[in-house]
């Protein structure tokens, strides 16, 4: 069984047991988090699609918090000997999917 969930303005396709990095969540390491905004669920029974499926949720355990690799931005003006460097490191939360519960069969 797999699901497509939305968190941090991005969509992720997940299966149980998978570990992935999502945008920073304000939860403690080791705690459980539930995602209720599930857009799609697929299994051997078929596919359930909806704007946000009712009674569908994905539970995950927070493994770690961290910062991604540095993204470097360079702006320059041609022929003017002007260059500006900037960069940042995005915060992320690493989660492990522990369960996917879907809507009741119809």
UniProtKB/Swiss-Prot annotation:
GO BP: translation
Molecular function in Gene Ontology: rRNA binding; structural constituent of ribosome
Cellular component terms per the entry's GO annotation: cytoplasm; ribonucleoprotein complex; ribosome
Cross-referenced SUPFAM superfamilies: L21p-like
The entry's keywords: Ribonucleoprotein, Ribosomal protein, RNA-binding, rRNA-binding
Pfam families associated with the record: Ribosomal_L21p
InterPro entries: bL21-like, bL21-like_sf, Ribosomal_bL21, Ribosomal_bL21_CS
Superkingdom as given in the UniProt entry: Bacteria
Function: This protein binds to 23S rRNA in the presence of protein L20.
Family note: Belongs to the bacterial ribosomal protein bL21 family.
The protein's assembly and partners: Part of the 50S ribosomal subunit. Contacts protein L20.
Name of protein: Large ribosomal subunit protein bL21
Name of the gene: rplU
